[in-house]
């Protein structure tokens, strides 16, 4: 997959293509529908599949105090798009240059790509202050001679799938429901840091990921059944998100994961924690023995949820 990181580089990709356009800030099922539609069209036209998106959330520039937590990292996005068979990813920073483009100027820049068709979602906007809509885009398609495919929004039950809805589910601990909208389990990746090793003393050693500086959506505090990816291999496990109320000495929330049937040193290594189901909320226990008993029950509950 070729990756283009600025508008000035667009001309470097000269092959005929079909372009999926969108912010794609979560790569949820609605986004995937747009991309899969573009993929089918590209195959039909014997063209390359291009995805045009932004490497940062537009709010970082236009509403810096209201940037929503990320549902996916840049590396995860690139990996998923490569798995989908994308030929070229246009992943440019949303900055003042982009924010100031009028809808027509945006399309003129996009014409550096040799596209025959654009595919967007029904709520797609573009250009300065989102002045461009699917209706102005349809008029431009007619005038400029390209095909436009507008995909209807995708729903899960009675709810339209959106990144906002998914963030709300994650914040409420409803990770199974979030997974239904994402089309995959929500995950957090990070580098394993040293902790206080209380888990090891309790018989449940944990791999700890600090969440303080990670601008990602963090599930509601509690215990979760998880799958953990270590060196490309998947393990079952249980994770706790929170402040360790029994000990009361944690100032920032932590993600602590006990990986079942795993031995080895993980300090300094990357791992990915995929949230499958919330088991319970955070509890302050009267003592260590009560905590141990609960951890044993938690492990049983997690193993059951992961079957």
Task: Name what the model sees in each region.
Residues 2-9, 90:
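Short acidic-hydrophobic, aromatic-tinged amphipathic segments that line or gate anion-handling sites
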Residues 9-12, 96-99, 155-159:
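A short acidic, often aromatic-flanked loop/helix-cap motif at beta-alpha or helix-coil junctions
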Residues 10-73:
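N-terminal catalytic cores of NTP/NDP-binding nucleotidyl/phosphoryl-transfer enzymes
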Residues 28, 81, 118, 178, ...:
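Residue-level signal for inorganic ion chemistry
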Residues 60-144:
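N-terminal Rossmann-like or analogous alpha/beta NTP/dinucleotide-binding catalytic cores
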Residues 141-242:
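Glycine-rich, Lys/Arg-enriched anion-binding loops that position phosphate/diphosphate groups
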Residues 195-307:
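Phosphate/ribose-recognition catalytic cores of enzymes acting on nucleotide-derived substrates
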């Amino acid at each position: 997959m070729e990756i283009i990181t600025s508008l000035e580089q667009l001309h470097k990709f000269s092959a005929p293509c079909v372009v999926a356009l969108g912010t794609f800030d979560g790569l949820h099922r609605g986004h995937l529908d747009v991309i899969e539609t573009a993929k089918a069209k590209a195959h039909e036209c014997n063209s390359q599949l291009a995805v045009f998106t932004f490497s940062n959330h537009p709010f970082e520039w236009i509403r810096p105090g209201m940037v929503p937590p990320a549902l996916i990292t840049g590396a995860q996005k690139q990996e998923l798009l490569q798995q989908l068979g994308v030929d070229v990813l246009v992943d440019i920073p949303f900055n003042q240059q982009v924010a100031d483009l009028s809808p027509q100027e945006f399309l003129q820049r996009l014409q550096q790509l040799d596209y025959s068709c654009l595919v967007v979602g029904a709520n797609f906007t573009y250009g300065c202050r989102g002045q461009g809509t699917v209706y102005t885009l349809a008029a431009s398609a007619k005038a400029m001679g390209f095909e436009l495919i507008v995909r209807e929004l995708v729903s899960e039950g009675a709810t339209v799938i959106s990144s906002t809805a998914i963030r709300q589910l994650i914040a409420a601990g409803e990770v199974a429901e979030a997974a239904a909208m994402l089309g995959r389990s929500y995950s957090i990746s990070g580098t394993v840091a040293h902790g206080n090793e209380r888990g090891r003393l309790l018989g449940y050693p944990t791999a700890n990921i600090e969440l303080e500086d990670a601008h990602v959506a963090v599930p509601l505090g509690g215990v979760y059944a998880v799958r953990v990816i270590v060196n490309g291999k998947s393990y079952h496990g249980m994770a706790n998100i929170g402040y360790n109320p029994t000990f009361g000495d944690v100032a920032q929330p932590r993600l602590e994961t006990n990986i079942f049937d795993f031995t080895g040193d993980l300090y300094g290594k990357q791992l990915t924690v995929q949230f499958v189901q919330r088991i319970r909320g955070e509890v302050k226990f009267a003592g260590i023995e009560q905590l141990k008993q609960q951890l044993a029950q938690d492990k049983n509950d997690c193993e059951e949820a992961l079957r």
